[in-house]
């Protein structure tokens, strides 16, 4: 990590650690074991970025409630993607919104099968509820995959521009 950071630090806005450890019902590792092993190793991994005051994001799919305190202790700044099938992003924002920037949560099922109006309404809701106080980056709950109609992705993006401006909600 140090070599990568030394080479690219000035060009990067943040560092993303992609480490899927969860599924819809919980962690794929015993929480006690996770707490014992993860913090020390992750602190060492992200130390070069933190030394240069870079933001560090953590990505994992699945239910995250048990790991937020650990992510906080390690020093992560951003959490991605807060899957809606496993996490109530509004409750996460209430509890952890002062500590982390939150990314994602627009269901890929909605993007795959929803109407443009349904997508627009969901984005509006998220911008209204997640926007106050900042710290939210609208995005999908996982990767934009094959099978998501391009027009639905465009609808999400347009709605984000329409509703997602801090301080000017709905005034594009």
Locate predicted features.
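Active-site loop segments of alpha/beta catalytic cores
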Residues: 1-172
């Amino acid at each position: 990590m140090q070599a990568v950071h030394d080479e690219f630090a000035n060009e990067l806005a943040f560092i993303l650690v992609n480490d899927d450890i969860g599924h819809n019902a919980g962690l794929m590792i015993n929480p006690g074991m996770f707490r014992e092993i993860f913090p020390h190793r992750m602190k060492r991994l992200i130390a070069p970025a933190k030394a240069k005051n870079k933001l560090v994001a953590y990505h994992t799919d699945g239910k995250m409630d048990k790991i937020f305190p650990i992510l906080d202790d390690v020093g992560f700044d951003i959490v991605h993607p807060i899957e809606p099938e496993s996490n109530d992003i509004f409750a996460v924002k209430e509890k952890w919104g002062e500590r982390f920037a939150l990314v994602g949560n627009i269901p890929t099922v909605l993007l795959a099968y929803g109407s443009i109006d349904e997508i627009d309404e969901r984005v509006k809701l998220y911008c209204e509820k997640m926007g106050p106080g900042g710290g939210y980056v609208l995005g999908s709950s996982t990767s934009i995959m094959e099978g998501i109609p391009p027009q639905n992705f465009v609808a999400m993006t347009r709605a984000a521009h329409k509703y997602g401006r801090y301080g000017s909600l709905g005034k594009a």
